[in-house]
A protein has these predicted regions:
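Binuclear metal-dependent hydrolase catalytic cores
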Residues: 1-187, 270-300, 317-320, 342-375
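A short local loop/turn or secondary-structure capping micro-motif enriched for an aromatic residue
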Residues: 52-55, 173-174, 195-198, 219, ...
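Short, intrinsically disordered/low-complexity patches at protein termini
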Residues: 69, 212-213, 223-224, 309-310, ...
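A general structural signal for short secondary-structure boundary/capping elements
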Residues: 118, 232-238, 305-309, 330-339
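Cap/insert and terminal regions of metallo-dependent hydrolase folds
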Residues: 184-186, 194-291
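A polyampholytic, Gly/Pro-enriched intrinsically disordered region
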Residues: 302-316
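Extended, charge-rich low-complexity interaction segments
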Residues: 314-347
């Protein structure tokens, strides 16, 4: 699949894996992230683990169309790239606000998606302040909605024919999974979880059922040099083994079962599939980054996406809004300008002058010209 080369049919769903890996960083697989595109024009991003922003950018989709993010839980391999995605919107021609959904606080209310997002704003306040005075103010606007993490089959989104439900998961308190239904199609995303009854019931019959899997305990001994106890705890508790995944899918009976959250390599993939097949014989995908599924009511295809590693931001979809001046606007300290040097600044100003002559503009350099302006 070459992004931008195929228009979705009005009744079609396309799902692109923009991150399929584990907490351990690796170039091959980013943290969990799935883009769901619908034939009605809606797009939803489920999780945004570390490294996923670059995968999304490689699809060449206008930034304003990627304005709905749903997070399953706040571990960094599922939410770690959200700050980068949010901050990059201004330099990627965003002209619309961003919407974020995620679980509310469990034992500590501040640990919910709202408290988390406020801390992100605080941590990156300098970045936002130094950019938004010259950018579209809508690009950093963020609307956050908390979801009750104990809600079972809880409808929290119902717009444009799309319904999205949350289900609890058994991972850490304050973790959820998602079920999206549209046009007779069903997408199920488990987030991180041990096998649980809620997914079995509410993901049943899904067209695409994405569920986490961890490597078998023996592989944790080999790949991560863990103790026997740590290998068992990491590979089986609060997560799902490949064999248990097979049992889950035997019960759920999806049109396509998708293994997520596992390192898919030449030596791990055969073991994972062998374990899954002990209980499940249906259609199966071992997800890797850029795998894509096109889903119709009467067909389902699995391919690989050829992303653009040299992508530039697509053009903005709506006109820019002028920056809004306020007393909180960032202003330069005059000390910074004392470091400018006439000979090198003159070269910069020469470039600006040539640009003005070429394009018929009259743009005044705001930095390189300041110390040398005539009084």
């Amino acid at each position: 699949y070459y992004p931008g080369s195929e228009k979705l049919n009005p009744d079609e769903m396309r799902v692109v894996a923009c991150g399929t890996g584990m907490p351990q960083p690796r170039l091959k697989q980013a943290g969990s992230c799935y883009l769901v595109e619908l034939g009605n024009g809606d797009k939803f991003i489920f999780d945004m683990g570390k490294g996923s922003t670059e995968r999304l950018a490689a699809l060449g989709i206008p930034t304003d169309q990627l304005n709905k993010v749903l997070v399953s839980h706040l571990h960094f391999d599922h939410a770690g790239d959200f700050p980068s995605f949010w901050l990059a919107r201004g330099v990627n021609a965003a002209r619309q606000p961003l919407f974020l959904w995620g679980p509310g606080g469990g034992q500590n209310p501040d640990w919910g998606i709202k408290g988390w997002s406020e801390k992100i704003k605080q941590a990156w306040a300098w970045d936002v302040a130094t950019r938004e005075s010259s950018g579209d103010p809508r690009s950093t606007q963020l609307t956050v909605t908390e979801i009750d993490w104990k809600g079972v089959n809880q409808l929290f989104y119902d717009e444009n024919g799309v319904k999205i439900y949350s289900i609890p998961t058994i991972h850490i308190d304050q973790s959820i999974g998602y079920i999206l239904e549209w046009n007779g199609l069903k997408f199920a995303y488990s987030g991180d979880t041990a096998p649980n009854k809620w997914f079995l019931e509410h993901a049943a019959g899904a067209d695409l059922a994405i569920h986490e899997v961890m490597l078998p305990p023996d592989m944790w001994l080999d790949k991560y040099s863990m103790s026997h106890t740590a290998a068992v705890m990491s590979g089986t508790q609060g997560h799902t083994t490949p064999r248990a995944f097979g049992k889950i899918m035997e019960i759920v009976e999806p049109r396509m079962a998708v293994v997520n959250h596992a390192q898919i390599d030449f030596d791990t993939a055969p073991v994972i599939e062998q374990e899954v097949r002990k209980n499940f014989q249906g259609p199966l995908s071992l997800a890797v980054d850029f795998m894509v599924w096109n889903i119709h009511k009467d067909s389902l295809t699995t391919r690989m996406t050829i992303g653009n590693p040299e992508a530039y931001p697509p053009p903005a979809q709506v006109p820019a809004m002028a920056p809004v001046a306020s007393d909180d606007d960032y202003s330069w300290d005059p000390f910074s300008f004392s470091g400018l040097e006439p000979r090198t600044s003159a070269v910069t100003n020469e470039v600006v002058k040539e640009f003005n002559e070429k394009h018929g503009t009259n743009i005044t350099p705001v930095v390189s010209n300041i110390p040398f302006q005539k009084k």
